[in-house]
């Protein structure tokens, strides 16, 4: 008789903690700007200072950029990306955002990543 371990799903707190650890481990390897990091059960949200920082994330991790109105003459540019794939095949969604004044000049490679 062979005993099989029982794998219990993580609690919401466990998911939040696991996601944060995954992103922090990635940041140890990639050294990307992440001045504000908020972990949730479904994703980790990073707010960066400017478009140059968003560009660093895009070059390192790839992904799709979404642009939405943030009101008062601002747009919110958000990169949808993930951590590298873990041993179990999973990855953590990462949302990297920066507020940008409407009409601001944006680098071509970032514009090219904007979802149609």
Q: Model features per residue range: what roles?
A:
Residues 1-116:
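Structured alpha/beta or helical-core interaction and ligand-binding surfaces enriched in interleaved
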């Amino acid at each position: 008789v062979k005993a099989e371990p029982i794998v219990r799903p993580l609690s919401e707190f466990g998911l939040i903690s696991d996601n944060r650890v995954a992103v922090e481990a990635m940041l140890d390897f990639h050294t990307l700007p992440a001045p504000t990091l908020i972990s949730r059960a479904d994703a980790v949200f990073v707010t960066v200072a400017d478009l140059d920082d968003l560009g660093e994330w895009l070059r390192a991790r790839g992904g799709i950029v979404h642009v939405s109105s943030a009101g008062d003459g601002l747009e919110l540019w958000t990169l949808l990306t993930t951590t590298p794939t873990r041993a179990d095949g999973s990855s953590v969604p990462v949302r990297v955002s920066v507020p940008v004044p409407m009409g601001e000049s944006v680098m071509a490679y970032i514009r090219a990543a904007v979802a149609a």
